[in-house]
Amino acid sequence: ATEGPDLGSAFLANKSNRMFISRKEKEDWNMYVMDLDKFFADVKKGKVGKPTAYETLLGTFPTSMGRPGGYAIDCNDDYAYITVEREGTEEEKERMAKNAFLPESNQPVKIKPSLCGIRKMNLATGEVTKVIDTEFKTGHIQASRFTPGEIVFCNETGGDAYQRMWFCTADGSVFKPLY
C-alpha cells in the first residue's frame, strides 16, 4: 500500500477505510487518498494493481504558499494541515534572528531558525489556504483526534527551546504557546 516512487508521509483516515499519502512528483507536492477497501479486496484475491488503481489525487500544493514539510489530518478527514518554510519579509527575518533560540555556549546550534508557517488543504476541493505564519522553524505537527481545527506543533531547534510546543486553530484566530 505504501510502495511507489517519491512517497512522502502516509496517514490513515479517522472516519473511513482510506489512507492519505503525499508524494513529491517533479516539482509538485501532491496529496492523494487511497481506497483501502478496494486495495485489500484485491490483496485477498491475489491480484493487486498499480498504485493508480487505488489512489485519487486530492490536490497539488502551490509553490507560492511555501515549501511543504510534514502534515497532519484533521479528525474529520476534511483538512490536511501542512508545515511550510517560506521566504518572508526583511522585517520578519530580522525579528526571527533577534528572537531565535540560542543554546548554551557549550552546545552547538543543531537546526538554524527559518521562517515557516502552517497551511491547510481542503481534502474535498484541493484548495490551499494560510493558517498562520511563524518566525521560527515549525517541526512536528499534530491535529487533535477529537476536536476539529485544533493543531499542535513544535518550534524545531534540534533540542531545547525557550518555548517548544505551540497551539493554533485552523482558522488562525488562536496562535499561542502550549503549556
Where is each model-derived feature located?
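Conserved beta-propeller blade repeats
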Residues: 2-22, 60-80, 135-154
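Residue-level detector of intrinsically disordered/flexible regions characterized by low predicted structural confidence
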Residues: 16-17, 49-52, 122
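Generic "edge-of-domain/loop-turn" microfeature
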Residues: 17, 26, 38-41, 78, ...
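Asp-box/WD-like beta-propeller blade repeats and closely related beta-sheet repeat scaffolds
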Residues: 22-117, 126, 130-133
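Beta-propeller domains
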Residues: 130, 134-179
